[in-house]
């Protein structure tokens, strides 16, 4: 299921980033009393009562030719376009301004639900000034204090009241849901078209659960797939060309709905920092991953070229050490058949379950080969392990003291579990828990 999206919008220096950090529970946005500090959209997730949602902090929109204002406004308008609900923030201390009214005009045109938050209401005496903002036309203003955390409960109650009921997944559980991500110009749309032209049977174009996303269903060699949000990959236009301006949020939503994510990189240009950042979105969400090296036809080769490039990928994407690597040319439609076995295996392993008895045999054997660590005379005791979830496979290891389970030993156990059961293509999570 895709989570509802909440965008925080307003002019500069009204406290958007402070409220964002309050909602997500950690300091993700930079907070300074300088207009324009948050130029790009910042993404995170939040929860309130029984509702999970994604939230975006945007840069401040203002009148005039301030530095980066064109970029900031474009970013904010994209966030508004993608949001289910908008928190429109104003500042009680400065009162209603022309910039507030300009932001209001943008929000009227969006026709989205808007919750008006009046920030910096730090005491009861200031509440009377809140009513000046009724003139903006968004109903009752919610007085809040970002610095003190006051009023956030009422504000979030109003926000989640606009969330609709969760939509049912329209696809069979055996259907593999694929998303294709990568920085601009690595050939994502070309890969989509190449895949759809490779011995495929297009069943239909159906509306996805994300607003205005188009998912494409197809079959290959007896397996059903759905390519998530093919419209998003093909969308063009001066604002939408840039990953930083449009497709980051769209990619996050597509990843969220996927089983398997194809991370596309450009063989001709090599790996850059942005590739790792984009791939990190899939890893953080615990999705199965296949790394696709596209434009392989453009590389001069000898017998060692592929191995050298694979070594470089492994070095740069160490956090994706479980992912298999496919070398393809979408333009020439070559080597595409190598993709599907990797996709299928990654999907199967993402859903794999291991019997507790077999798992504990492996864990016991691992401990006998490499005894558990000690700290200040205390040894880590591992009592037993069990698998508690799939997608991704998640294991709980019951121990005498969680603090004694160092990262290095947890990694060792993960490697032993992988050696025994495979799990190619998928992350696995190991959680240490104290036995009662």
From Swiss-Prot:
<feature type="binding site">
    <location>
        <begin position="119"/>
        <end position="122"/>
    </location>
    <ligand>
        <name>GTP 1</name>
    </ligand>
</feature>
<comment type="similarity">
    <text>Belongs to the TRAFAC class TrmE-Era-EngA-EngB-Septin-like GTPase superfamily. EngA (Der) GTPase family.</text>
</comment>
<feature type="binding site">
    <location>
        <begin position="57"/>
        <end position="61"/>
    </location>
    <ligand>
        <name>GTP 1</name>
    </ligand>
</feature>
<dbReference type="InterPro" id="IPR027417">
    <property type="entry name" value="P-loop_NTPase"/>
</dbReference>
<feature type="domain" description="EngA-type G 2">
    <location>
        <begin position="176"/>
        <end position="351"/>
    </location>
</feature>
<keyword id="KW-0547">Nucleotide-binding</keyword>
<comment type="subunit">
    <text>Associates with the 50S ribosomal subunit.</text>
</comment>
<feature type="binding site">
    <location>
        <begin position="182"/>
        <end position="189"/>
    </location>
    <ligand>
        <name>GTP 2</name>
    </ligand>
</feature>
<protein>
    <recommendedName>
        <fullName>GTPase Der</fullName>
    </recommendedName>
</protein>
<dbReference type="InterPro" id="IPR032859">
    <property type="entry name" value="KH_dom-like"/>
</dbReference>
<dbReference type="Pfam" id="PF14714">
    <property type="entry name" value="KH_dom-like"/>
</dbReference>
<keyword id="KW-0342">GTP-binding</keyword>
<feature type="binding site">
    <location>
        <begin position="294"/>
        <end position="297"/>
    </location>
    <ligand>
        <name>GTP 2</name>
    </ligand>
</feature>
<dbReference type="GO" id="GO:0043022">
    <property type="term" value="F:ribosome binding"/>
</dbReference>
<feature type="domain" description="EngA-type G 1">
    <location>
        <begin position="4"/>
        <end position="167"/>
    </location>
</feature>
<feature type="binding site">
    <location>
        <begin position="10"/>
        <end position="17"/>
    </location>
    <ligand>
        <name>GTP 1</name>
    </ligand>
</feature>
<dbReference type="InterPro" id="IPR016484">
    <property type="entry name" value="GTPase_Der"/>
</dbReference>
<feature type="domain" description="KH-like">
    <location>
        <begin position="352"/>
        <end position="436"/>
    </location>
</feature>
<comment type="function">
    <text>GTPase that plays an essential role in the late steps of ribosome biogenesis.</text>
</comment>
<keyword id="KW-0690">Ribosome biogenesis</keyword>
<feature type="binding site">
    <location>
        <begin position="229"/>
        <end position="233"/>
    </location>
    <ligand>
        <name>GTP 2</name>
    </ligand>
</feature>
<dbReference type="InterPro" id="IPR005225">
    <property type="entry name" value="Small_GTP-bd"/>
</dbReference>
<dbReference type="InterPro" id="IPR015946">
    <property type="entry name" value="KH_dom-like_a/b"/>
</dbReference>
<dbReference type="GO" id="GO:0042254">
    <property type="term" value="P:ribosome biogenesis"/>
</dbReference>
<keyword id="KW-0677">Repeat</keyword>
<dbReference type="GO" id="GO:0005525">
    <property type="term" value="F:GTP binding"/>
</dbReference>
<dbReference type="Pfam" id="PF01926">
    <property type="entry name" value="MMR_HSR1"/>
</dbReference>
<dbReference type="InterPro" id="IPR031166">
    <property type="entry name" value="G_ENGA"/>
</dbReference>
<dbReference type="InterPro" id="IPR006073">
    <property type="entry name" value="GTP-bd"/>
</dbReference>
């Amino acid at each position: 299921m895709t989570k509802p999206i909440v965008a925080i919008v307003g002019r500069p220096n009204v406290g958007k980033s402070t409220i964002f950090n309050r909602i997500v529970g950690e300091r993700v946005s930079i907070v300074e009393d300088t207009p324009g500090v948050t130029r790009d959209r910042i993404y995170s997730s939040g929860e309130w009562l029984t509702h999970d949602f994604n939230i975006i902090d945007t840069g401040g929109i203002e009148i005039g030719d301030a530095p980066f204002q064109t970029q900031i406004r474009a970013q904010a308008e994209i966030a508004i376009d993608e949001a289910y609900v908008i928190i429109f923030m104003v500042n009680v201390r400065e009162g209603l301004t022309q910039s507030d009214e300009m932001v209001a005009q943008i929000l009227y045109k969006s026709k989205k639900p808007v919750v008006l938050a009046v920030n910096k209401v730090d005491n009861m005496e200031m509440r009377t000034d809140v009513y000046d903002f009724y003139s903006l036309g968004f109903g009752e203003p919610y007085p809040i204090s970002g610095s003190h955390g006051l009023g956030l409960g009422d504000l979030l109650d109003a926000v989640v009241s606009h969330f609709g009921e969760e939509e049912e997944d329209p696809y069979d559980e055996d259907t593999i849901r694929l998303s294709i991500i990568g920085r601009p110009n690595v050939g994502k749309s070309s890969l989509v078209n190449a895949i759809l032209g490779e011995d495929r049977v297009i069943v239909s174009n159906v509306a996805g659960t994300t607003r205005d996303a188009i998912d494409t269903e197809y079959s290959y060699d007896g397996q059903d797939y759905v390519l998530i949000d093919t419209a998003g990959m093909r969308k063009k236009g001066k604002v939408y060309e840039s990953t930083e301006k449009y497709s980051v949020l769209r990619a996050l939503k597509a990843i969220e709905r996927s089983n398997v994510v194809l991370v596309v990189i450009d063989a001709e240009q090599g790996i850059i920092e942005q590739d790792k950042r984009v791939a990190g979105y899939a890893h953080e969400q615990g999705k199965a991953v296949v790394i696709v090296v596209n434009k392989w036809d453009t590389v001069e080769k000898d017998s060692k070229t592929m191995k050298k490039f694979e070594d470089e990928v492994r070095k740069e994407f160490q956090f994706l050490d479980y992912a298999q690597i496919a070398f393809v040319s979408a333009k020439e439609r070559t080597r595409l058949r190598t993709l599907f076995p990797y996709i299928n295996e990654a999907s199967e392993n993402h859903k794999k379950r291991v019997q507790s008895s077999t798992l504990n045999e492996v864990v016991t054997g691992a401990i006998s080969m490499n005894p558990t660590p000690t700290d200040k005379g205390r040894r880590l005791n591992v009592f037993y392990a069990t698998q508690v979830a799939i997608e991704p496979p998640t294991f709980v290891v019951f121990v005498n003291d969680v603090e004694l389970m160092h990262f290095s030993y947890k990694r060792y156990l993960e490697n032993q579990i992988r050696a025994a059961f495979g799990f190619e293509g998928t992350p696995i999570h190991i959680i240490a828990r104290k036995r009662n």
